[in-house]
């Protein structure tokens, strides 16, 4: 039976199940999607019409075509992100009411470039209103090279123009081997990390939850036995359902499940999508004295996220001014976007 415990059973299936506890609906049979982007066409059109009642099916089809077009831009998704996060014009997401959006999750959904034939399959993909905005790659625990291999793999994908639309569309990428961080090693060998798109290489960030009660007290939704069997059957591992190790790996407090709650719970994910990404033109001086400019995309570090949430809480309580204390040597320049 030990052979059944691989990435699927140790991390992937429990993670997909955990996302259902966070309010995502699992999809095991996807047929109506845009092949160039993996956008779920039926869900997208239905959601956009709901958020923009003045639009009809034809308008939404044209909007989808526009999105597919700009996702090919060599801009790390900047044009699309401006459209996604904007509070003006056509709404792709309702940022103020999570329940007014459609949340889906699936596993092993292939990203295929028809022209080159190149493809990759994220272990888990998360959708909001049909848009695949996050994916999770998992490795089994105690695989010394697992996280480093994932970092090398995503770097190759980011540099491959065949995958540009998929990378530009994906806002958040999470990588985990379901172990606690190795704080003695600066190289990301074990733990749960996150990053965003890049033109060259990914920067893996750690995430440390500031609210000790957030994960434990989150209002998780019950998941039906039918949904659990659906996921297990889709991944062809229903035989492990009643094994003790499988039950252990479903705990909300595993490293993978903790980062999913912290970053992909519906309210948190919407906050990140609205405020958590910045595009920066970095200038570098070459050996001959000339200068070159490179467009970079940055995602909030966890310190910035919790500072932002604290500011929002103060504003909600009528506080109009305050100070954020950023200690010496803690990366003020790197975080000041």
Residue ranges and their predicted role:
Residues 2-337:
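ATP-dependent helicase/translocase motor core
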């Amino acid at each position: 039976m030990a052979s059944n415990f691989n990435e699927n059973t140790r991390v992937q299936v429990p993670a997909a199940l955990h996302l259902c506890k966070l309010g995502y609906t699992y999809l095991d049979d996807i047929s109506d999607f845009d092949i160039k982007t993996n956008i779920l066409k039926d869900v997208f059109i239905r959601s956009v019409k709901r958020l923009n009642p003045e639009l009809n099916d034809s308008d939404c089809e044209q909007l989808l075509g526009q999105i597919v077009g700009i996702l090919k831009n060599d801009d790390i998704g900047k044009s699309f992100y401006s459209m996604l996060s904007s509070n003006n014009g056509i709404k792709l997401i309702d940022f103020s009411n999570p329940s007014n959006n459609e949340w889906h999750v699936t596993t092993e959904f292939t990203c295929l470039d028809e022209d080159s034939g190149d493809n990759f399959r994220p272990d888990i993909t998360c959708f909001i209103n049909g848009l695949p905005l996050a994916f999770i790659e998992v490795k089994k625990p105690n695989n010394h090279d697992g996280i480093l291999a994932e970092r090398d793999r995503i770097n190759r994908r980011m540099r491959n123009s065949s995958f540009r639309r998929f990378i530009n569309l994906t806002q958040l990428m999470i990588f985990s081997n379901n172990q606690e961080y190795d704080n003695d090693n600066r190289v990301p060998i074990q733990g749960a990390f996150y990053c965003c798109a890049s033109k060259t290489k990914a920067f893996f960030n750690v995430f440390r939850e500031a609210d000790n009660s957030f994960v434990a007290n989150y209002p998780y939704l019950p998941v039906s036995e039918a949904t659990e069997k659906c996921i297990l059957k889709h991944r062809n591992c229903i035989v492990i359902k009643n094994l003790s190790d499988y039950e252990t790996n479903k705990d909300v407090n595993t490293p993978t499940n903790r980062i999913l709650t912290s970053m992909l719970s519906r309210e948190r994910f919407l906050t990140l999508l609205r405020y958590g990404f910045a595009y920066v033109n970095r200038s570098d001086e070459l050996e001959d004295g000339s200068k070159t400019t490179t467009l970079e995309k940055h995602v909030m570090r966890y310190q910035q996220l919790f500072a932002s949430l604290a500011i929002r809480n103060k504003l909600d309580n009528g506080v109009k001014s305050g100070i954020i204390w950023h200690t010496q040597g803690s990366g003020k320049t790197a975080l000041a976007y």
